[in-house]
Regions:
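Specificity-determining recognition surfaces
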Residues: 98-105
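Accessory recognition modules or surfaces
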Residues: 4, 8, 49-62
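An amphipathic, aromatic/His-enriched active-site/gating alpha helix that lines ligand/cofactor pockets
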Residues: 18-40, 56-96
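Residues that cap or initiate secondary-structure elements
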Residues: 13-15, 59-61, 101
Length: 107
């Protein structure tokens, strides 16, 4: 059964525009190139520290493969991962697995 990850991040003060640019120009295109399905990304309308994005997985096996393809890659380790802590409070990261309700259009 398909499920989503609702990923909520706390962006360091004054870093939201830089974070959004990094996500939209580097992280999201890279993850999509590895097969990740990104269904949306959002920033807080009134809270400039809140960034949320959604990723969809067909099942746990595909999630595990995609995680390995992304996070164990040389590009992630050498070009992307080290830049994240200067933009995000990793302690404030919340990842919630969610499933669509029966009548949801997000099956």
């Amino acid at each position: 059964m398909a499920f989503y990850e609702l990923r909520q991040y706390k962006v360091w003060p004054g870093k939201m525009d830089e974070w959004v640019s990094f996500m939209e120009k580097e992280i999201i295109p890279f993850q999509i190139s590895k097969g990740m399905v990104i269904t949306g990304s959002f920033r807080g309308e009134e809270d400039d520290s809140t960034y949320i994005w959604l990723r969809r997985f067909e099942d746990e096996k595909s999630r595990e493969k995609l995680y390995a393809d992304v996070y164990e890659s040389d590009q992630w380790k050498n070009e992307i991962a080290h830049r994240i802590p200067e933009l995000l409070d990793r302690e404030g990261m919340i990842v919630t697995r969610i499933v669509p309700t029966p009548k949801s259009t997000s099956q």
